[in-house]
Structure formats: structure tokens, C-alpha cells
Amino acid sequence: FYQSLSYFISYHILSQLTISYRTSLKMREEQILKRSALSPRERKGIHMKFYGMQKLSLLDFPGKMCATVFTGGCNYRCPFCHNSSLVEAERLCGGQTIDGEEVIRFLRRREGILEGIAITGGEPTLWGEQLVSFIRKVKEQTDMLVKLDTNGTHPDVLRECIAAGIDYVAMDIKSSEERYHIVAGHADTRLDKVKESISILLGGEVDYEFRTTAVKPLHTAEDFNGIGQLISGAKRYFIQCYKDSGDILIESDEAAAEYERSAVGTAELGAYSKDELESFLAIAKKYIPTAELRGVD
């Protein structure tokens, strides 16, 4: 009797702990998203700031020698994100930021050496008016070209950035429509907004590229048919090889890890072989003949 009672009590406690853990995980996910994915409207009145700056890059702006600045916060939770510390930057960076005006002063000192600045994240368009104002000041006060990285979830901000004078946009295409939520790590992908941003870029108002980081097991060959249909006729499209930076989101964020496990199981993230990437590329070329691989050894 006592053995059965002990088993029942242990089982009950374990069940309650499991429920409590899942509840706290869900609450934590909601708190993280609320804190680090403020909308452009919610950021109104917050001064533009960056959470890091690379003073020289030969990779971030195609064909240009540039500086790269990193914005904080993101409305996606891609489990393979290589800048996971920026997703929760406002919590993890402890207030250590770089003021936008300081960045502009740096650029003015580097005129004649640097050719441009790449703005990445995180998701830069979450900064809305602050981002647009910063871009406008860079164009007015320096001779630098400006490149913007984005996931395309805020086409209204993208339009304003184009009007402010950006020179190049690199937009991530996470996956096919059916599996976008899996790769984005979030049920609310704002896919209608993503499609709107795709249309803006295809319209030719600014130079651009689309890109997809192929990650095993998140992507399949069929996904590249879907991606091709989304951006058919694009000027440039790159399939990028996944590389573990040591700062990927799934290893630092319980909510992202839980979402990835529920979506694709427990398989570890990894890179596809060159042959596998070539097969994806062949599919993409049916829709974008100029498609290329990037970052393949």
C-alpha cells in the first residue's frame, strides 16, 4: 500500500512540475516577444541606438568596404539565428549601446576609406521612424552607401527607408509559405507583410537580393519550389550554407528550443552538403535563373 501511495504521490508531483514548467516557458516566451519585438509604433520616442558595430567588413555589403551596425530585438525566433544575443539585446547587453549620432561621427571620419554602412540585426525595421531618421542623416551628412538587412515583416518601414535613400536591401526568405512558421520559429510570421515587401523589391525601386539559409532538417527540396514561386523573376537570390556561429538561438533560448522541438523533432541543426545545396539551387533556378550558392566551401 505504502509503495503504491509513494508512486502515486511521485507521479502527481512530476505531472504538476511538468505543467508548471510548460506554463512558465509559455509565459517566458510571451514576455521575451513583448520585450524584444516592440513594433515601430511602440518604439516611437526611443532614440536610435545600436547594440554593436563592426568597424570594417568586406562581406556584409556586396562589393563594398563597409562598417556594420547591429540593431537589437527581433519579431522572429529562427532557431538557427547566428546573432541570438541580439534577439534579446535589451536584456543581454545590459544597456551597453552605441548612439546613432556616434555612428554617424565615425562614418564621417572614415570617408574616403569606407564605402558604406550595413544595418543588420536583430530586425532593423522594428525601429521604424528612428531607423528612417538615422538613414536620412547618414545620406545627408556623409557620402556613404547604405545597405539594409530585413526579414520583410514591416513593408511600410521598408518603403520609408527606400524613400530616405538606402542603396541596397538584403531580404531573408525563410522558407515556403507552408513551412515559414517552422523556420521563423514563430506562429505569427506576418506572411502577408513579407509578401508585400517582396513585391516592393521586385518593383525595382532599390537594388536588392533575396537569400535563404538552408538548414538541416528545417528545409526540404520542396521548400525551394515554394520559395521560387514567392520570388519568381527576382534579380538576385542566394542559397546560403548554414554555419554554427556558436551563438545560435536554439542553444540560448528555451522558448526557441521548445518551438523547434515541437515543429521538427529533436534532430540537431546542421549544414547540407554541397551536392544537396546544388540540388536545391537547381530547383531555385527554374524560377530565378541567376540564383547562386553563397558560403559553400
Identify the function of each model-found stretch.
Residues 3, 61-98:
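Canonical Radical SAM [4Fe-4S] cluster-binding loop centered on the CxxxCxxC motif
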Residues 45-63, 216-297:
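Auxiliary Fe-S-binding modules of radical SAM enzymes
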Residues 104-116, 126-254, 269, 274:
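Conserved AdoMet/S-adenosylmethionine-binding subsite of the radical SAM
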Residues 4, 17, 31, 35:
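Cationic, low-complexity basic patches in intrinsically disordered or flexible, solvent-exposed regions
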Residues 22-26, 32-47:
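Short, Lys/Arg-enriched N-terminal segments with co-localized hydrophobic residues
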Residues 96-106:
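Glycine-rich, highly charged phosphate/nucleotide-binding loops
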